[in-house]
Amino acid sequence: MKVGCPKEIKPQEFRVGLTPAAVNELVRRGHSVTVETNAGQGAGFVDSDYEKEGADIVGSAKEVFDKADMIVKVKEPQAIERKMLKSGHLLFTYLHLAPDPEQTHDLIDSGCTAIAYETVTDLNGGLPLLAPMSEVAGRLAPQMGAWTLQKANGGRGVLLGGVPGVAPAKVLVLGGGVVGTNAARVAAGMGADVTVLDKSLSRLRYIDDVFGHLFKNGYASQKATAELASQADLIIGAVLVAGAEAPKLISKEQLSTLQSGTALVDVAIDQGGCFETSRATTHADPIYEIDGIMHYCVANMPGAVARTSTLALGNATLPFIISLADKGWIKACSDNPHLFNGLNVHDGKLTYSAVGEALGIETAKPDHKALSVLH
């Protein structure tokens, strides 16, 4: 198969879809790989690193799209990239379609087949291609929250860990999944007073068993959320409904109940955000203020640590990339129903029901058992 990797063009996105090691694996298996010049530069890989492993370096994204059967990226294709997609293309990347009708319609209109990292599953019902970036974003969230809390940035002027004789900051983490537990671990490690809320009792039991000595946990009732939010210095939004738009946990009206200068870090912003007042920001302009409350809503947080993020993502995606390249998407998805769960768009149709429900678009997913007859 002809595999292509363009340079990411989302603002301040420094990750890359393929590492030189991934190129080596693909080339050794008889596939050709085309990489846009400087695609890996932000993650610490130069063109010669890719050339040594057998990649063909080209000067533009258009050349990558023109040559490739499968396009491997990190972030959702931007408008100019979507114009280069066509029927016969296989796109493998993060998509986050539920809050993005424009991208969804463009992908449908392109006729491409699009498999989203964030909806690929595993035997335990987990999200193996979302997990590594959730770990990174979760661990970054307290750092970004601590920065946002600084007075010069509009925050409360509270040090996360406090000092002897002065209480530490109170951190509320909404959601006890991969993002939430990683955020809570780091915040607790920085000395903060941390509470994690979740609605899953089994998850709360796990958190209590594993992390009970580090931070508190509680059931995420509306009353508990409101009370703890009103006392918090930093609130980290870490909820996820796979492939669907994130639920709104703090309304605009509730901002008046928070302490002035409270920092909100919305890790769920890729899926629309879990605070009503959230809107996507960039690393260049990451925070904004509404009613005295500071919001940090960078949509590609792991891009700030591109080297770590690229290596972690590559470790997770490579087995799936190899399977897709070796077998083609139909056989690969037929053999692996968890990869099939990643199918979001195919042949001019939306195929992921949670996105259809969020956007009011009819979905038509092929039957898994009938994949072998597709062409």
Pin down the residues of each PLM region.
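Adenosine-phosphate binding glycine-rich loop
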Residues: 118-144, 148-159, 269, 274-375
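Residue-level detector of alpha-helix initiation sites
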Residues: 76, 136, 177-178
